[in-house]
């Protein structure tokens, strides 16, 4: 019998940080979901995300938080910020475009000036956060660690 498979303390010590990371990754989505139900239900992008896309991100980031907790936390909070920024920016852009719209713009509203640009803004912001984190993790963080080691010696 392998001792590490039956060691209760070892299991508990490994399980607790993983649960904390999963809860921390879910926290911004729970807050956004509740805020959407209470205040933002009339806004297009919040309502669209509430209809099922929050759930997909929750599941993915919970699974990711087991192996890559820092990446999952950065992705979760970056995604929440991107959703909020994209929604308000998309609504403001659409209202501005309504003021300058011509009758032809109303005919082709799904692809023209009157389309809601929140999904594209969200995708760009989300991938910007991911790329910046990957660049930080691969380039900047090792340099910081090396500098700390040199100063400590």
For every predicted segment, state its role.
Residues 1-8, 145-153:
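Short, charged juxtamembrane terminal tails flanking transmembrane helices
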Residues 9-13, 17, 42, 46, ...:
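Juxtamembrane/transmembrane-helix boundary motifs in multi-pass membrane proteins
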Residues 26-36, 78-92:
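Aromatic-anchored segments of alpha-helical transmembrane domains
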Residues 25-28, 101-149:
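Alpha-helical membrane-associated segments of multi-pass integral membrane proteins
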Residues 53-77:
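Canonical alpha-helical transmembrane segments
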């Amino acid at each position: 019998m392998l001792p590490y498979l039956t060691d209760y303390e070892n299991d508990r010590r490994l399980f607790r940080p993983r649960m904390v990371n999963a809860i921390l990754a879910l926290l911004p989505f729970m807050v956004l979901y509740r805020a959407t139900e209470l205040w933002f239900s009339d806004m297009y992008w919040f309502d669209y995300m509430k209809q099922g896309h929050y759930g997909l991100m929750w599941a993915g980031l919970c699974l990711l938080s087991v192996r890559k907790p820092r990446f999952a936390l950065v992705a979760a909070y970056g995604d929440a910020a991107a959703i909020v920024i994209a929604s308000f920016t998309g609504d403001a852009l659409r209202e501005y475009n309504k003021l300058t719209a011509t009758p032809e713009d109303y005919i082709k509203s799904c692809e023209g000036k009157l389309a809601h640009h929140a999904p594209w803004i969200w995708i760009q912001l989300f991938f910007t956060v991911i790329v910046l984190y990957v660049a930080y993790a691969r380039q900047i963080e090792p340099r910081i660690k090396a500098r700390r080691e040199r100063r400590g010696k």
